[in-house]
Amino acid sequence: MHHESPIRRRKTRQIHVGKVAIGGDAPISVQSMTNTETRDIAATVAQIRRLEAVGADIVRISVPSMDAAEAFKTIRAQVETPLVADIHFDHRIALQVMEDGVDGLRINPGNIGSLDKTRLVVEMAKDKGIPIRIGVNAGSLEKDIQEKYGEPTPEALVESALRHVSILDELNFHDVKISVKASDIFLAVSAYRLLSEKVDYPLHLGITEAGGLRSGTVKSAIGLGLLLRDGIGDTIRVSLAADPVEEIRVGFDILKSLHLRQKGINLIACPSCSRQEFDVITTINALEARLEDILEPMDVSVIGCVVNGIGEAKEADIGLAGGDKRSILYYRGKQVDRVENNDIVDVLEKRIRAEIAERQATRHEG
């Protein structure tokens, strides 16, 4: 049940954040940001490792001080994922983290001091092959732009972004990606669409300050979905007032839904009704908890009855259609067994892990 996406992605320049390619024909990357105190090295490393475990491509860390920059050096040595340092105002912090192995910078060249200070940062970034993300936010536009437009508008966000781009252009630096984030979906979507018409740099998508787990997921799915459907976007972050791990999970769910990237188990499940032959909701919750460590793409269908269950099961890699006391198990489109309803979770987990092991063995032999 693996579908090619009908979406034709916008062609952009390609950059690299560490080992991760962004733009061009590279897969859309999913990233998050730590919410620990960066100087708390143990907590920050632990959180990054949790993000790594669920498939984060890139992790951003706020580095607001030289003390935090010192901590960053130790953090960098203890994790594998490419790290982006989020820096404001003090160019010395940018210089320090570049010496200590940062993979990318999130700065706005216009707010880290004089042109000479900006030049120092840009020259080192160029020398070390470190890309810069220009991050414009509707809540922190420059004073003159606020006065010009009166309020955040798509044109205001794009003008701010292009102002920062022009500084890097003047310094002959083009290893750049850009974001123009807002908490309002319509503002953010319009700004990204306008920006995409003016530059060929890769774009980092996000609906900033989207809200808690439920409301933030909905806002991000709508906003990012609209842009991704237009072929706009090379890397995404789902901003949630929640565990950053959820940002990665939701991000991949958005990409899976649009057939833009497959990672992990794609669970297809009915919402359940009185026809269900087993407790679908409890079963799905248990499966999600047991299978969250799996990054291998696989479609698994779990439907509570045979009305839609058989058709869905035949389309999935592994599928189950509910039956009276015993449900029907399908593997690669064919019925292979009947499963006691009390054993569904155990049997499906075993089948899924066996299928993954077989795939990995086949790839290794190849």
Swiss-Prot record:
Keywords: 4Fe-4S, Iron, Iron-sulfur, Isoprene biosynthesis, Metal-binding, Oxidoreductase. Its cofactor is [4Fe-4S] cluster. [4Fe-4S] cluster binds at residues 270, 273, 305, 312. Binds 1 [4Fe-4S] cluster. One of its GO terms (biological process) is terpenoid biosynthetic process. Pathway: Isoprenoid biosynthesis; isopentenyl diphosphate biosynthesis via DXP pathway; isopentenyl diphosphate from 1-deoxy-D-xylulose 5-phosphate: step 5/6. SUPFAM superfamilies: Enolase C-terminal domain-like (SSF51604), Nitrite and sulphite reductase 4Fe-4S domain-like (SSF56014). Pfam families: GcpE (PF04551). Its EC number is 1.17.7.3. This is 4-hydroxy-3-methylbut-2-en-1-yl diphosphate synthase (flavodoxin). It comes from Acidithiobacillus ferrooxidans (strain ATCC 23270 / DSM 14882 / CIP 104768 / NCIMB 8455) (Ferrobacillus ferrooxidans (strain ATCC 23270)).
